[in-house]
UniProtKB/Swiss-Prot annotation:
Keywords: Carbohydrate metabolism, Glycosidase, Hydrolase, Multifunctional enzyme, Polysaccharide degradation, Xylan degradation
Catalytic activity: Hydrolysis of (1->4)-beta-D-xylans, to remove successive D-xylose residues from the non-reducing termini; Hydrolysis of terminal non-reducing alpha-L-arabinofuranoside residues in alpha-L-arabinosides
Active-site residue list: D16 (proton acceptor), E224 (proton donor)
Induction section of the entry: By xylan.
Molecular function terms, GO-annotated: alpha-L-arabinofuranosidase activity; xylan 1,4-beta-xylosidase activity
Keyword rRNA-binding: no
Signal peptide interval: none
Regions that span the bilayer: none
GO BP annotation list: xylan catabolic process
Family statement: Belongs to the glycosyl hydrolase 43 family.
Protein name per Swiss-Prot or TrEMBL: Xylosidase/arabinosidase
Annotated positions for site Important for catalytic activity, responsible for pKa modulation of the active site Glu and correct orientation of both the proton donor and substrate: D137
Length: 325
């Protein structure tokens, strides 16, 4: 399906959006790309982001978007090394908790927490990362019953292949072919929102026969960019396939899964990465994502986009064409 799309921040490079509705207003929490001069490589060193802005709006497709400025930077974070990648924010009891991936001073990705009294920040970081945290792409789900869940993980530069059973390996292992694909992770958060309340679990995605997706199934298996939303009582776990550049989704009956693969949300865009948020606002559903058209294909200089997202009568997401030409 081709659909009208809008670039939201044409004057800057913003990507990897997390999007939520707080107090009737829509807030966007993107990563902030810039020209760092670092050569492109499979570890993603060229994605050398160092701060976050927050944006808000009342009218998605036509309204003004407000930039609330820098709300957190690596200079504010005591344990910071480099590469402040994509974050997410959740509200509990009037406090706003930002979860962010950042390499520590040993060049290992950890997940940190920063807190604000306002959805637009500024966010004050904790002195240390979450205990036992690793990898990238935190996405937080408020299940509406007092429980909050954090999804995380990403391959290659995201370092997920360096871990098994939540323990670091001596060397990274990437499965191949018919071996089971490396899954995303999920854990319930502690009451104070600062730690895992339990050991992170695998987010298993099943094929049509009820079998876990394999590493060789690169157009369906998880790579990075976890997101969760709920529609008509079903849990929709969506994600990027990374090196095949698709946004896909799977559905399940609870936040832990397992989830059964359903299809493609967004076909490849211009640029290597694809990352997204799905949110309902004022009776319509939207897909926030990014591409590299304004930077003429520089994959480390991405631009924030949005379009409407639709479901068919059976609750399947109607696939959106990533390229507009």
């Amino acid at each position: 399906m081709k659909t009208e799309k809008r670039y939201l921040v044409p004057g800057d490079y913003m990507a990897d959006p997390a999007v939520h509705v707080f107090d009737g207003k829509l807030y966007i929490y993107p990563s902030h790309d810039w020209e760092s001069g670092i050569a492109e490589n499979d570890n993603g060193d060229h994605f050398n982001m160092k701060d976050y802005h927050v944006y808000s709006m009342d009218d998605v497709m036509n309204g003004e978007i407000k930039d609330h400025g820098v709300v957190l930077s690596t200079e504010d974070i005591p344990w910071a090394g480099r590469q402040l990648w994509d974050c997410d924010v959740v509200c509990k009891d009037g406090k706003y908790y930002m979860y962010f991936p950042l390499k520590d001073q040993n060049d290992i990705f950890r997940i940190g927490v920063a807190v604000s009294d306002k959805p637009y920040g500024p966010f004050i970081p904790e002195a240390n990362p979450m205990k036992g945290s690793y990898s990238i792409d935190p996405a937080v789900w408020d299940d509406g019953d007092g429980n909050y869940y954090i999804y995380f993980g990403g391959l290659w530069g995201g370092q997920l292949q360096r871990y098994r059973n939540n323990k670091a390996l001596e060397s990274a292992i990437l499965p191949e072919g018919e071996e089971e694909a490396i899954p995303s992770r999920v854990a319930r958060l502690s009451e104070d929102m600062m730690e895992f309340a339990e050991e992170p679990r695998a987010v298993v995605i099943l094929d049509e026969d009820g079998k876990p997706l394999t590493a060789g199934d690169t157009e369906r298996r998880f790579f990075e960019a976890s997101w969760m939303h709920k529609y008509n009582g079903k849990y929709y776990f969506s994600y990027s396939t990374g090196d095949t550049h698709l946004l896909c989704y799977a559905t399940g009956d609870n936040p832990y899964g397992p989830f059964t693969y359903q299809g493609v949300i967004l076909t490849p865009v211009v640029g290597w990465t694809t990352h997204h948020a799905i949110v309902e606002f004022k009776g319509k559903w939207y897909l926030f994502h990014h591409d590299c058209v304004p930077s003429e294909g520089k994959t480390w200089l991405r631009s924030l986009k949005v379009c409407e997202l639709q479901y068919d009568a059976d609750g399947r997401i109607i696939t959106i064409e990533g390229k507009d030409e």
